[in-house]
């Protein structure tokens, strides 16, 4: 005999299983995308580009313009203070 509590428990278990399966599927997709990105960096390095510099540029492009400009200004200030310009 199923009680309301048993049905609620079954629904909760099914919902939990669904969440976990979605997370696992997304983790697989994330790994595949990371592998694809790694392949692109390998390809660009093979074409003579500096992968470290490209990674830096990719990171800079993710930033908002004003944040990037602020960071660059602070770095330039510190470089000037250390006589690096």
Curated annotation (Swiss-Prot):
InterPro entries: GapR-like, GapR-like_DNA-bd
GO molecular function terms attached to this record: DNA binding
Pfam families: GapR_DNA-bd (PF10073)
Domain of life: Bacteria
Family, as annotated: Belongs to the UPF0335 family.
NCBIfam families for this protein: PRK13694.1
Database matches in HAMAP family: UPF0335
Name of this protein: UPF0335 protein BARBAKC583_0130
